A protein has these predicted regions:
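Helix N-cap motif at beta-to-alpha junctions
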Residues: 13-14, 77-80
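Conserved active-site tyrosine of GNAT-family acetyltransferases
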Residues: 17-22, 86, 114
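Residues in the helix-turn-helix
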Residues: 150
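Conserved beta-strand-loop-alpha-helix junction that forms the acyl-donor binding cleft
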Residues: 8-14, 101
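A broadly structural signal marking compact, well-ordered functional cores
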Residues: 1-10, 21
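Vicinal oxygen chelate
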Residues: 1-5, 27-74, 83-110, 122-133, ...
Length: 157
């Protein structure tokens, strides 16, 4: 049996990345092995030089930071407050808060090694916001594509 365990990001400076993920994003340390650090929730960071050595060396396995091959996705129920905090930090934005076609508001920015981080508004918050703007549960379902029963359960509570 195969079991998924973690996503691993290669980083230049373990301490700088720990400060970012723990301090800004609130990640909780699971294991610190020096060259490899794992956080609760399935994210790990690995020191570039050590990782390249495991893979056969930098000539065989070059690392390209900022290549935009993917992103790490997080959610918050306080997107505006988190965005204001980001503006106080020394982060480079991919973009400020934008609304996706399905109604969710998100912000994207870079970690210290230019991995893309997305912080999205929790979908439950999207439903409540849209409902307060006059959308019916059916209209929210059409816009978001989420199951109607889920939307109705959120709006009832």
């Amino acid at each position: 049996m195969i079991k998924y365990m973690t996503t691993l990001l290669v980083v230049e400076d373990i301490q700088r990345s720990r400060n970012f993920y723990e301090g800004l994003l609130g990640m909780k340390l699971q294991h610190d092995l020096g060259v490899n650090v794992s956080f609760e929730g399935g994210l790990a960071i690995h020191l570039k030089d050590h990782f390249q050595g495991l893979m056969g060396g930098p000539e065989r396995f070059p690392i390209v930071f900022g290549a935009h091959y993917g992103e790490l996705y997080f959610e918050t129920d306080e997107i505006e407050a988190f965005f204001q905090r980001l503006k106080q930090e020394d982060v480079a934005f991919v973009h400020e808060i934008v609304e996706q076609p399905w109604g969710q508001r998100v912000v994207r920015f870079y970690d210290p090694d230019r991995h893309v981080i997305e912080i999205g508004e929790q979908m439950e918050a999207v439903f409540v916001r849209m409902h307060s703007q006059g959308f019916t549960a059916q209209q929210i379902q059409q816009k978001t594509g989420m199951p109607l029963a889920f939307i109705e359960a959120v709006l009832i509570n």
